[in-house]
Amino acid sequence: MLRFSFTLLLIAVTHPLFAQFTYAPINVPGATSTEARGINNNGEIVGFYVIAACVEQRQSMEVPTCPTHGFKLVNGRYIELMVPTSFRTAIMGVNDYGDLVGFYVTSELTCSSSVYHGFIWYHTNTVRKLDYPGTDVCPTSSSAAITVPFGINKAGTVVGGVWGIDPNGSSRSFPSRGWVWKSGTFSTMNPTLPGNPAGACCWSVTGISNTGVLAGLLFQSDFWQAWMKAGTDQDFFTYPTVNQCCDTTATGVNSAVDMIGFDGGPSSFSAGNGWFTKHIELNEVNDTEVKPSFIKMAYPGSTNIQPPGPLPTFPFGINDARGIVGTYIDTNNQQHGFLAKPNF
């Protein structure tokens, strides 16, 4: 269902000559906040926006709790997308065919609470409901398990997680498990560190490349950790930051195994230190895993606190040309989308 479209040219933000990325803002006209979540190899960008007075908190950036409307940005034109019968739609990813994934919220006569469903919105304009087993139920408690698809590749494989959420949408808790959906079947995806140490929990798959490489997060050894899985090879890593030790969220991966993410994790305060790392497999020495080399991502500008710091920046989607989309927070605590292109 296409509700409206606007044409808008992306204007690059002025940046220093030494900047690693050139940024352009993404703002849906009339919205109070905009988040860009996915980009495909054709340059189509998807995400969601809010028109109410609602701001996502930094400790809950992965899954939105505000009343969202989905959008697609194609050739400078914004198109609103709402799943039929829904009053909230969040688009989280897009593949090269233009198939979309995300979740929506609706009312059902047999349920007194709002009901959440994952979905695939095919480029043929057919919507398929996508619910991990056990999540397609009427919420009966203050925390319901919902299906959150984060990405889809050209083969039609979808990845995501099962997340706990307040049925009223006012708060969000940890993920419980990651999953991969292929040819109509869900498979659980919960990788653990070498040696399978005790205490692992709270998985989610957050990205998939056209070559089938997976990105995700888990909580283990006292920290949120990012991971990459390519076949039987698994890498686990954390991002260094001055504000906290090691909590790390990975949000996307492309066919070259370039990865993106930010510091922090679910219900863990994030300073908004975005990061990019080139082909993570090149970090291996004689098949021994080593810490990736990170390039910091920060939307141009600075905070108005003392001492001033970079604007909080959250990369969420990456394509094979290293085009990156995400969200930044301005000095008025408002969220905006962005498109970043590398200068290397």
Describe each model-derived feature in a short phrase.
Residues 1-6:
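Bacterial N-terminal signal peptides that target proteins for export
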Residues 19-344:
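Residue-level hotspots at or immediately adjacent to binding/recognition sites across diverse folds
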Residues 7, 17-18:
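Cleavable N-terminal signal peptides
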